[in-house]
């Protein structure tokens, strides 16, 4: 084989693997799990659906080692986080290639170009990404397309990739039901999808200032508030 290179993609800042080996449909789950535990990434060249099955098998093997009990709640939490981090690192070792337009050059691979573009922006050459992250893009794309029902809003919010989704209603209900000291002005710091700003606007607050330091969150909030026709208040 000839040497080749590709851009490394990791939305969560995982470092590129130091060692990479080619893997295909002939690789067993035990061998894949062992290599991943040793720090060797597996660049998949086989069938895409078989890669998904292999990832599930690797996850089952990783879950055979639960965190050890701690002598205190803090220590137990630390061990739990340690185990979860190790699990994520192992499962992140199964890699798939992406073409410049985000096409996946594998047999039976789905068309995930739109999901990748929504998360990564325009393509910048060939790349490698963990299959686990790629499957996360699929879930995020479905949320963005279909939206999440927010009962307190009586409508849907469409979260973008990397923006916290309002799937838990407790904090939204709290803002929807809490007495307001004034209807003149409110601030939504860390607006995310814009869901709380939208709830406050629907409650009659005249002017809401919504802020966030993440450009993707700001774009998401603007899109949601425009869809809900609340941009005159927020």
Indicate residue ranges for each PLM-predicted region.
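Proteins with a high burden of low-complexity, intrinsically disordered sequence enriched in S/T/G/P/A and R
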Residues: 1-19, 50, 86, 159, ...
